[in-house]
Swiss-Prot record:
Coiled coil: none
Signal peptide: none
CDD domains: Ferrochelatase_C, Ferrochelatase_N
Enzyme class, first EC level, given as a word: lyase
Record protein name field: Ferrochelatase
GO biological process, one term: heme biosynthetic process
Role of this protein: Catalyzes the ferrous insertion into protoporphyrin IX.
EC numbers on record: 4.98.1.1
Molecular function terms from GO: ferrochelatase activity; metal ion binding
Protein's pathway: Porphyrin-containing compound metabolism; protoheme biosynthesis; protoheme from protoporphyrin-IX: step 1/1
Catalytic activity reported: heme b + 2 H(+) = protoporphyrin IX + Fe(2+)
Database matches in InterPro entries: Ferrochelatase, Ferrochelatase_AS, Ferrochelatase_C, Ferrochelatase_N
Subcellular location(s) per record: Cytoplasm
Length: 388
């Protein structure tokens, strides 16, 4: 078959406190995170937002040791995957490509070309597809493939989502069962699935299949678990007053507390590695909300990380992908006919003198409004939570 490679995609995270500001800048520079009518405004606005949010984010990272463990865990997953693939008879080089921090996806691609990889499996470490996670990485890779001639000879295939993979479901069920056994009455514990949220408009206007895949994944895990426990699905990490997928995790915890739930185990359903949203948001912030709501026995299921059943599931995904017809980045970026990846081309105005004059006037008004908001502490960006 030739030299085989596997590219693991993930979000990335700051390794130390000094990295938080640059990481946030990279995050908000992504048009899939903040969409603006003028592309050249993206980076200045990203710099302003990152500058305002850095201190608060650093405090959160201090609570989990001063940095994100995501890179370390992802690299460990890669090493375990390489070993398991070898055990199953498939030798492969493993590469890690992060979207917003080192090692960047571009760095991984450079190494892939240097290593003369002939067959590549692109595997996002997001079980469920969303335009803001896997979709953003796929758009970047598609752009790199179009611009870099050295990538053209590589036969590649994409795994867009894999939440139905039996091994993944089994790993999640085993982790939940182990945590349930820590309670005096395991069958009476309420199972609380918490997924990373996205704005509701992503689903209703852009056709993002994320909510459907999360709901299906929850049902499949409960079916695999085969326990009588009641369960709830909620969405965390909402920012600002814009409506996101509901119910919100914080509200759902309060409601369960009001209903008299005392024993609860949280399942981070959209995360396969420990990071800020599991270690700080769930373990610290939501634990406090739960306890204040009367839920006194609060536990969390660990992320799969390098769980052997989970790693074997990833290996099976890779082997199956190599056997089946290739799935291209252009297909992955448009998984459904209705999915709109918000191409920035729609905002490119003609470069006429008149257009440039109006563009300049609008930009000036925008910057003036931004400066006024930064000085006064009030305005649209504060309302939606991008400035604090």
């Amino acid at each position: 078959m030739g030299r085989v490679g596997v590219l693991l995609l993930n979000l990335g995270g700051p390794d130390k406190l000094e990295d938080v500001g640059p990481f946030l800048y990279n995050l908000f520079s992504d048009p899939e995170i903040i969409r603006l009518p003028f592309r050249w405004l993206q980076k200045p606005l990203a710099w302003f937002i990152a500058s305002r949010r850095t201190r608060t984010s650093q405090q959160n990272y201090k609570q989990i040791g001063g940095g994100s463990p995501l890179r370390r865990i992802t690299e460990a997953q890669g090493e375990a995957l390489k070993k398991q693939l070898g055990y199953l008879g498939q030798e492969a080089n493993i590469y890690v490509g992060m979207r917003y921090w080192h090692p960047y996806t571009e760095e991984a691609i450079a190494q892939i070309t240097q290593d003369n990889i002939e067959h590549l499996v692109i595997l996002p470490l997001y079980p469920q597809f969303s335009i803001s996670t896997s979709g953003s990485s796929f758009r970047l890779l598609d752009k790199l493939w179009q611009e870099e001639p050295k990538l053209q000879p590589i036969e590649y295939t994409v795994i867009p989502s894999w939440y139905k993979q039996p091994g993944y479901l089994q790993a999640m069920a085993e982790l939940i069962a182990q945590e349930l056994e820590q309670f005096p009455n395991p069958d009476e514990v309420h199972i609380f699935f918490s997924a990373h949220g996205v704005p509701k408009s992503y689903v209703e206007e852009a056709g993002d299949p994320y909510q459907q895949e999360i709901e299906e994944c929850t049902a499949l895990i409960m079916q695999t678990l085969n326990r009588p426990n009641a369960h709830t699905l909620a969405y965390q990490s909402r920012v600002g007053p814009v409506e996101w997928l509901q119910p919100y995790t914080e509200d759902a915890l309060k409601e369960l507390g009001a209903q008299g739930v005392k024993d609860l185990v949280v399942v981070p359903i959209s995360f396969v590695s420990e990071h800020i949203e599991t270690l700080q948001e769930i373990d610290i912030e939501y634990r406090e909300v739960a306890e204040e709501s009367g839920i006194h026995n609060f536990r969390r299921v660990p992320a799969p990380n390098t769980h052997p059943v989970f790693i074997n599931a990833l290996a099976e995904l890779v082997i199956d992908a190599l056997k089946n017809p290739s799935f291209k980045l252009s297909q992955a970026a448009q998984m459904k006919k209705m999915v709109k990846m918000y191409p920035q081309e729609r905002w490119e105005w003609g470069l006429t003198t008149s257009a440039e004059v109006w563009n300049g006037r609008i930009a000036m008004l925008g910057f003036i409004a931004l400066i006024i908001e930064l000085i006064t502490g009030h305005g649209f960006l504060h309302m939606i939570g991008l400035l604090q």
